[in-house]
């Protein structure tokens, strides 16, 4: 569970965790504060084996169906590391150096939260401020869906493999 209320989170970053905060991301504003469940959907895909089909965060006061049923297509995000994250923006920015001369991420954070966990067991919750998952078949462009209530986002989903994909 991500506890957005304790930290006053109202913005989230949807991004490959190896990207700086200026590259191929989707920054979402007006996110409802509160507790969020972190969810992944896995399925078996032939010779590929079991893969993460989608990842999502969902406010504990709400429900929605996986795989963009009723969600708003809010854009796409790129993956180059085989992983995806949904994180508090301030938490994400803290671990990603972003200026003209330097563009790098906090290697200790990356190794602890991405390499050691997400790559080994398909997902990881980082300090209750971020959710990291492996990304289906790996690198590519993926759809981001949002679910709203009274003008505030209460759910975010990244779909790596749709039900129609037959890879």
Listing of model-derived features with the role each one plays in the protein:
Residues 1-167:
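Intrinsically disordered, low-complexity acidic regions enriched in Pro/Ser/Thr
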């Amino acid at each position: 569970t991500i506890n957005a209320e304790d930290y006053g989170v109202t913005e989230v970053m949807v991004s490959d965790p190896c990207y700086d905060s200026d590259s191929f991301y989707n920054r979402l504003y007006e996110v409802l504060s509160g507790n969020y469940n972190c969810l992944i959907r896995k399925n078996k895909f032939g010779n590929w084996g079991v893969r993460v089909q989608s990842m999502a965060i969902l406010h504990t006061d709400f429900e929605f169906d996986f795989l963009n049923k009723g969600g708003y297509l809010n854009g796409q995000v790129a993956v180059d590391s085989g992983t995806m994250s949904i994180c508090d923006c301030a938490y994400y920015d803290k671990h990603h150096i972003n200026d003209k001369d330097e563009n790098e991420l906090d290697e200790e954070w990356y190794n602890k939260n991405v390499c050691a966990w997400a790559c080994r067991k398909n997902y990881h919750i980082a300090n209750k401020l971020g959710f990291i998952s492996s990304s289906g078949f790996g690198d590519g462009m993926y759809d981001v869906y949002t679910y709203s209530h009274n003008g505030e986002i209460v759910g975010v989903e990244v779909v790596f493999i749709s039900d129609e994909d037959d890879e």
